[in-house]
Amino acid sequence: MAAVILERLGALWVQNLRGKLALGILPQSHIHTSASLEISRKWEKKNKIVYPPQLPGEPRRPAEIYHCRRQIKYSKDKMWYLAKLIRGMSIDQALAQLEFSDKKGAQIIKEVLLEAQDMAVRDHNVEFRSNLYIAESTSGRGQYLKRIRYHGRGRFGIMEKVFCHYFVKLVEGPPPPPEAPKTAVTHAKEYIQELRNRTIIHAL
């Protein structure tokens, strides 16, 4: 009698375990078959580049500051528009533009720029805080997290929690002059030159 009871309890326990696994109790964000999800720090490692000594008459090499913020709870596409807005501006002009923007990403980028500005003075021997301009400013796709979206009639779907990265590069000195917009004649000349540069593949 005791053996029969134990067998029934064991069968119920196995069924319960199978039910939990089928319902997906384990977090799906930790179940993957891809490569390692370790975050690459290539952007920050550019701050550690050591250049060879300069010649006596050579002009001084401007300081370059690489900074970023990762896993921001924001869309990479919305962040890209703000990143492109301040590209090529001086640091003060970029901060002024972001100050009067009501978007969530603008305040995040402003915090990153202030951190990079402090880093320039503290770690890269930049004398004047305002003598910087944004050479590169872009966003990237972060690590998305999968979650369950509950539907009616006991059904469900999979939704993604989106995250993004923001990267910025500051360079010491005044910003370069803006490029003049291309005219229709310039576009036509470039198109004709591309046609002339065509080659026939697998030919002599």
From Swiss-Prot:
Cross-referenced CDD domains: Ribosomal_L22
Superkingdom of origin: Eukaryota
Subcellular location(s) of the protein: Mitochondrion
Presequence range in chain numbering: 1-38
GO biological process: translation
Pfam families, A to Z: Ribosomal_L22 (PF00237)
Principal place of residence: mitochondrion
A single MF term (Gene Ontology): structural constituent of ribosome
Xref: Gene3D superfamilies: Ribosomal protein L22/L17 (3.90.470.10)
Signal peptide start-end: none
Protein's UniProt keywords contain Mitochondrion: yes
PANTHER family on file: CHLOROPLAST 50S RIBOSOMAL PROTEIN L22-RELATED (PTHR13501), LARGE RIBOSOMAL SUBUNIT PROTEIN UL22M (PTHR13501:SF8)
Similarity comment: family membership: Belongs to the universal ribosomal protein uL22 family.
Name of the protein this chain belongs to: Large ribosomal subunit protein uL22m
Originating organism: Bos taurus (Bovine)
Taxonomic path: Eukaryota, Metazoa, Chordata, Craniata, Vertebrata
Gene that this polypeptide is encoded by: MRPL22
